[in-house]
Amino acid sequence: TADTPASYFTDVLQPTALTDSAISTRVPILMYHHLAEDVTNDEMVSPEQFEAQIRALTEAGYAGISFDELQAYVLRGEPLPKKPVVITFDDGYLSNYTLAYPILQKYGMKATIFSIGVSFGKDHYKDTDYAMTPHFGAAEAAEMAGSGLISIQSHTYDMHQWPPYEDGSAAVRENILQLPGE
């Protein structure tokens, strides 16, 4: 294990050339969910931890790229920065806007946020009174996308709140490779 964020990125994320491939640069992809001062699970990171990681990436010479830039490299051989990194956020939490976005702006680091459509701008689960961690809405998405640093993409419309998905029902297995005996 690494002792500091900088040593983690130095030790783990070194791009290495691939052999027998047209792709000559490995691109690390870092995935986050939610930033919070009170970290209560492995899907969360504090703003201080996140900033330390982004600072370490920047100091190590990494440049954030979008998935469009990665795709252009893979499909057309368009050049990438010397040390590219893709930073992603799943689900579209409001903290991506209020906490992560200012840090990404400070360091000029690009990121892609995969927002859940049905949760867009919401703080309650659909059709319920149950509170959920707030998600950013259209105004925040427009501001971030307009910055040129953030790309907003889809992370399903409603799959995260589909009852059979939540309760592990066999209905989830429809149209999926069958298991032996099915």
Regions found by a protein language model. Name each.
Residues 69-70, 82, 86-94, 99, ...:
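Substrate-binding cleft of extracellular glycoside hydrolase catalytic domains
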Residues 25, 33-40, 83-85, 105-182:
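Metal-dependent polysaccharide deacetylase catalytic core of the NodB/CE4 family, i.e.
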Residues 102:
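Short, well-ordered alpha-helices that flank and scaffold nucleotide-derived cofactor binding pockets
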Residues 5, 46, 66-67, 95, ...:
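General structural signal for secondary-structure boundaries
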Residues 2-85:
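N-terminal pre-catalytic segment of deacetylase/amide-hydrolase enzymes
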Residues 44-58, 92-93, 133-143:
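Aromatic- and glycine-enriched glycan-recognition loops and surfaces
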